[in-house]
């Protein structure tokens, strides 16, 4: 077991989870090359690694989480997003193994998402879209966000990219879009980890036999620490930028990383 490799995988998870570059795909690639994991097992490990990111979001947004439970409308909206995410995401997760075994290239959805973010930015830049709060959204808007998050169960599709871009398109101000995207992430990620353990128990056992429980814990803790720092930096960035600048930046990151993924 190479300790540096395990820490690197945790760092990859801690950074990529909060950017529109599909953390599960980045962990898939890094663990495939660093730990020599088969693709399907590396994908399951990528989802399992979200445990570290769940910790990051839960600790960072602990005050927001408490306020959610005091606000019935906000709690209802996040519950609906979670339910829709599960209805869309679980079937897609079940077929993900088959997709990865049939020459499915996860970098393609990242390129498409990057282009969509840039188009979204152009639309916002040249239209008179009304800025509103998350609680001003309609039920239809909330369902749309849930569908967007559920689609991220597919390899190469970024959860944060899908939800943040959808919220920006709906007129949510950037820092709120990031904040509520990350709050919606917590229950969805808990479900993703649970689904991974339920349907991919053999894959996770293989990883544990290879790097040990200690190795998995080190990787998860690395993801947790780096995730806290990344969330803070992104929220600071979002507060100081216009919506379309956020879209252009995230879209550019998604396209660059996906091209690098293809080259690797």
UniProtKB/Swiss-Prot annotation:
Family per record: Belongs to the UppP family.
Lineage: Archaea, Thermoproteota, Thermoprotei, Sulfolobales, Sulfolobaceae
Compartments, record wording: Cell membrane
Catalysis performed (reactions): di-trans,octa-cis-undecaprenyl diphosphate + H2O = di-trans,octa-cis-undecaprenyl phosphate + phosphate + H(+)
Main location per the UniProt record: membrane
Enzyme class: hydrolase
Species of provenance: Sulfurisphaera tokodaii (strain DSM 16993 / JCM 10545 / NBRC 100140 / 7) (Sulfolobus tokodaii)
Transmembrane helix in keyword set: yes
Membrane topology: Multi-pass membrane protein
Transmembrane segments: 34-54, 75-95, 104-124, 137-157, 180-200, 207-227, 243-263
This enzyme's EC code(s): 3.6.1.27
PANTHER family, per database record: UNDECAPRENYL-DIPHOSPHATASE
Alphabetical keyword list: Cell membrane, Hydrolase, Membrane, Transmembrane, Transmembrane helix
Example GO molecular function: undecaprenyl-diphosphatase activity
Annotated protein name in UniProt: Undecaprenyl-diphosphatase
Role: Catalyzes the dephosphorylation of undecaprenyl diphosphate (UPP).
Domain of life: Archaea
Gene Ontology cellular component list: plasma membrane
């Amino acid at each position: 077991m190479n300790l540096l490799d395990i820490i690197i995988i945790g760092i990859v998870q801690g950074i990529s989870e909060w950017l529109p570059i599909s953390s599960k795909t980045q962990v898939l690639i890094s663990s495939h090359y660093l730990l020599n994991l088969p693709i399907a097992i590396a994908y399951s490990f990528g989802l399992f690694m979200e445990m570290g990111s769940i910790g990051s979001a839960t600790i960072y947004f602990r005050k927001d989480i408490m306020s959610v439970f005091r606000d019935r409308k906000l709690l209802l909206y996040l519950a609906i997003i979670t339910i829709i995410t599960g209805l869309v995401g679980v079937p897609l997760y079940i077929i993900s193994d088959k997709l990865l075994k049939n020459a499915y290239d996860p970098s393609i959805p990242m390129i498409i998402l990057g282009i969509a973010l840039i188009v979204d930015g152009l639309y916002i830049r040249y239209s008179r879209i009304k800025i509103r709060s998350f609680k001003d959204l309609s039920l239809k808007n909330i369902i749309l966000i849930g569908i967007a998050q559920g689609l991220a169960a597919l390899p190469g599709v970024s959860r944060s990219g899908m939800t943040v871009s959808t919220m920006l398109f709906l007129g949510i101000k950037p820092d709120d879009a990031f904040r509520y995207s990350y709050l919606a992430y917590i229950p969805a990620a808990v479900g993703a980890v649970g689904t991974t353990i339920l349907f991919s128990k053999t894959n996770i056992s293989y990883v544990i036999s290879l790097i040990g429980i200690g190795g998995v814990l080190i990787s998860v803790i690395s993801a947790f620490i780096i995730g806290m720092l990344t969330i803070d930096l992104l929220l600071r960035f979002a507060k100081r930028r216009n919506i379309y600048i956020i879209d252009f930046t995230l879209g550019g990151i998604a396209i660059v990383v996906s091209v690098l993924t293809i080259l690797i």
